[in-house]
Swiss-Prot record:
Entry EC number(s): 2.1.1.-
Gene3D superfamilies assigned: Vaccinia Virus protein VP39
The organism of origin for this protein: Clostridium tetani (strain Massachusetts / E88)
Entry's family note: Belongs to the methyltransferase superfamily. PrmA family.
Name the UniProt record assigns to this protein: Ribosomal protein L11 methyltransferase
UniProt keyword Transmembrane, yes or no: no
Catalytic activity: L-lysyl-[protein] + 3 S-adenosyl-L-methionine = N(6),N(6),N(6)-trimethyl-L-lysyl-[protein] + 3 S-adenosyl-L-homocysteine + 3 H(+)
Phylogenetic classification of the source organism: Bacteria, Bacillati, Bacillota, Clostridia, Eubacteriales
Positions annotated to bind S-adenosyl-L-methionine: T166, G187, D209, N251
Amino acid sequence: MKKEDKDWIELTIITSSQAVEAVSAILYNTDVQGIAIEDSKDVEFQKKNKGDWDYFDETLINIEEGAVIKAYYREDKNFMKYLKYIEESVKNLEQLGFDKGKGIVTTSKVNEEDWENNWKKYYKPTKVGEKIVIKPIWEEYGENPEEIILELDPGMAFGTGTHETTRMCIESLEKYVKEEDVVFDIGTGSGILGIAAAKLNAKKVIGVDLDEVAVDSAKKNVGFNHLDNIEILHGDLMEVVKGKCNIIVANIIADIIILLSKDVKKFLEDGGYFISSGIIKDRKEEVVDSLKENGFKIEEIKEQGEWVCVVASL
């Protein structure tokens, strides 16, 4: 007897590019099973840098200004509670300093088989920086010998390197990671930044995350890349990591980076680098001021779209 497909709920949020990370954070506070993002800023970047892409989805060209975020939920008794929370949180984004854009939230049903297969169309091989290529494990890619390939199964809830914050962090890792370096990746998510550091010949990499789902995802991705110089830990940096490193990378949010700037020094060797992103432009000065107040020297500030990456050193 054929197994009957279950229905899922596809929740669609139309917002601004600036609010993508904030809306994603709202969704992660619920029992979301997957997220797909169509961002006009990403499409604009792809069009300008089309030569860096193995694949460019022409069907995304007509995305309106802003972003469309699709989240997937099991159809169960808890969904209406999540929906109310999401609607209220999106409505309140402007009180937190975000442009919510249209701020429209809608829902529809989607068949399980369609959901499981169709989300993968959003992820194609992507060149990031000088030589790193992020390749979903199900995609074929004719690699160049000079390129560094990162095999990734992002699942539905983690980034694949196309977002500006991830891209700027990887570009910074390419610039600053040296052989024999030890690198700590805070809030590792899919493990993409830690894996990039390991592939760039860091001697040792430790990735940490408070989310058990992220830890499991990162460990699987480390396995796909056959790396033995990277360890993924569950917990808080201050509690689970011992020793010092040459580079700390954190792609989180401005508030957490400001908090880290006060304590992260104890984990850095003299002359070490703190690479931070997930910072919206409106919070740039706060982050920079906090780093300076806590003894860091600003090496460089990168900006792409609405986002900022700050590289600081001791």
